[in-house]
Amino acid sequence: MNPNQKIITIGSISLGLVVFNVLLHVVSIIVTVLVLGRGGKNRICNETVVREYNETVRIEKVTQWHNTNVIEYVPYWNEGTYMNNTEAICDVKGFAPFSKDNGIRIGSRGHVFVIREPFVSCSPTECRTFFLTQGSLLNDKHSNGTVKDRSPFRTLMSVEVGQPPNVYQARFEAVAWSATACHDGKKWMTIGVTGPDSKAIAVVHYGGVPTDVVNSWAGDILRTQESSCTCIQGDCYWVMTDGPANRQAQYRIYKANQGRIVGQTDVSLDGGHIEECSCYPNDGKVECVCRDNWTGTNRPVLVISPDLSYRVGYLCAGLPSDTPRGEDAQFIGSCTSPMGNKEYGVKGFGFRQGTDVWMGRTISRTSRSGFEILRVKNGWTQTSKEQVRKQVVVDNLNWSGYSGSFTLPVELSGKDCLVPCFWVEMIRGKPEEKTIWTSSSSIVMCGVNYEVADWSWHDGAILPFDIDKM
């Protein structure tokens, strides 16, 4: 066979293979259409079946691939329904990690806000982290001087829980240097306090729209909880303070429905001090554990009924939970009066468990470092010192800060009780470290029916940043 004949033969074989390959593709397409395109019961690809129930809607996405059914259950909350939140707090044995945002570590190279006062609140379908920004980013020149609490640049924003407070996912909520937020089952309500110290104003937003205001009544830094407010059967409650941080101030409970204030009452606590309350629903009432920045190292307790009647006193436990504080052995508890050294404090929390109490506190007695949570037997009703459980969340070699409470609603958790949860702020930068800025990240823990080992979920950012070296 001469060279020309070889070329013709190879070309003919190649052409034949190409034609055969094309025919195979055509046959494959025809078979696919015939198999997947048949009528009758098998023609349900990508159909959605919706079955309605009394309280919620369960959506079943049914996709059939060659006679194999894949069913995905998607929970859906009817947004026309208020959350109940009259259930009791679940009895828990420990607290497991729910989320950690690592905002400062990520912010060394990412577009993350400079923040303080982060807190968590939940709707029937999600939990969100709220935070007060400083109108600046980490590792940027505008972060200089952000140790200041109140400025016209501070805003309340939020992200899905676990996300760092970044510019790409954050949602604006209110102009604020003090704030609270909660969901009634229909929409989010946020309260942002802003303005000059002597004439501050709290703007109530409902569903993202301003609906009401509270003006400063004492002319001395109107402020609110820095943690979740509480909604029960459509009505939402929060606590505000106006007056000195180191002397007698004035305290009020507010009640709103769909973002409009429908009631308020003054709280009388002569010789005591209430601010930055951490509140949660329990057995149809609002229970708050607050900060006494004037007279004691035990925490004020405020229990609010739906009609705005209240009971006020102090956490009975014979262990102090504010910072700074004295030795546990030297502390005498009281259910009615402030006890301990008369110094400033830090925002904290507690949960009632029957007559017991879970109480969070820094490990250090003198500074905002470390964090632990203790269960004190009969500590809600008696001056007991008996610790039945203790769990370390941040070790004493690392900074902590504010802490506060929230609950997982039954609509979200699927339980028949409210899951107690808390968050711990971990402050970095000024005044304790050599930076030009102050910011924080947070760890969030939720109650479980198991004991959880001690560990340190600390912030972990390596400081200083580049901006601090200029």
Curated annotation (Swiss-Prot):
EC number annotated for this UniProt entry: 3.2.1.18
Q: Which residues bind Ca(2+)?
A: 292, 296, 322
Q: Does the keyword Hydrolase apply?
A: yes
Question: Which reaction does this chain catalyze?
Answer: Hydrolysis of alpha-(2->3)-, alpha-(2->6)-, alpha-(2->8)- glycosidic linkages of terminal sialic acid residues in oligosaccharides, glycoproteins, glycolipids, colominic acid and synthetic substrates
List every stretch annotated Involved in apical transport and lipid raft association: 11-32
Please list the residue ranges that the record places on the Intravirion side of the membrane: 1-14
Which GO CC annotations does the UniProt entry carry? host cell plasma membrane; membrane; virion membrane
GO-annotated biological processes = carbohydrate metabolic process; viral budding from plasma membrane
Binding residues annotated for substrate, in chain numbering = 116, 150, 275-276, 291, 368
Q: Which GO terms describe its molecular function?
A: exo-alpha-sialidase activity; metal ion binding
Major place of residence: virion
What the entry says about post-translational processing?
N-glycosylated.
Where is region (Hypervariable stalk region) located?
32-86
How this chain sits in the membrane, per its record, is: Single-pass type II membrane protein
Compartmental location: Virion membrane; Host apical cell membrane
Q: Which Pfam families match?
A: Neur
Q: List the disulfide bonds.
A: 90-417, 122-127, 182-229, 231-236, 277-290, 279-288, 316-335, 421-446
Virion surface compartment ranges equal 36-470
Its required cofactor(s), as named, are: Ca(2+)
Entry annotation: catalytic residues: 149 (proton donor/acceptor), 402 (nucleophile)
Q: Function, please?
A: Catalyzes the removal of terminal sialic acid residues from viral and cellular glycoconjugates. Cleaves off the terminal sialic acids on the glycosylated HA during virus budding to facilitate virus release. Additionally helps virus spread through the circulation by further removing sialic acids from the cell surface. These cleavages prevent self-aggregation and ensure the efficient spread of the progeny virus from cell to cell. Otherwise, infection would be limited to one round of replication.
Please identify the protein, giving its name as recorded. Neuraminidase
